[in-house]
């Protein structure tokens, strides 16, 4: 496997994994206002 491909997969995994958490945190802060 190419390191570039692995890097892209890791990046996508991090974005998909952290995206909902970040959005949820921002939504929670906005909702508490």
From Swiss-Prot:
It comes from the Eukaryota. One of its GO terms (cellular component) is photosystem II. It is a single-pass membrane protein. It is found in: Plastid, Chloroplast thylakoid membrane. GO terms for biological process: photosynthesis. The keyword Transit peptide does not apply. Keywords: Chloroplast, Membrane, Photosynthesis, Photosystem II, Plastid, Thylakoid, Transmembrane, Transmembrane helix. The chain crosses the membrane at residues 5-25. It holds the Pfam family PSII_Ycf12. A core subunit of photosystem II (PSII), probably helps stabilize the reaction center. PSII is composed of 1 copy each of membrane proteins PsbA, PsbB, PsbC, PsbD, PsbE, PsbF, PsbH, PsbI, PsbJ, PsbK, PsbL, PsbM, PsbT, PsbX, PsbY, PsbZ, Psb30/Ycf12, peripheral proteins of the oxygen-evolving complex and a large number of cofactors. It forms dimeric complexes. Belongs to the Psb30/Ycf12 family. This is Photosystem II reaction center protein Psb30. The lineage of its organism: Eukaryota, Viridiplantae, Chlorophyta, Mamiellophyceae, Mamiellales. The gene is psb30.
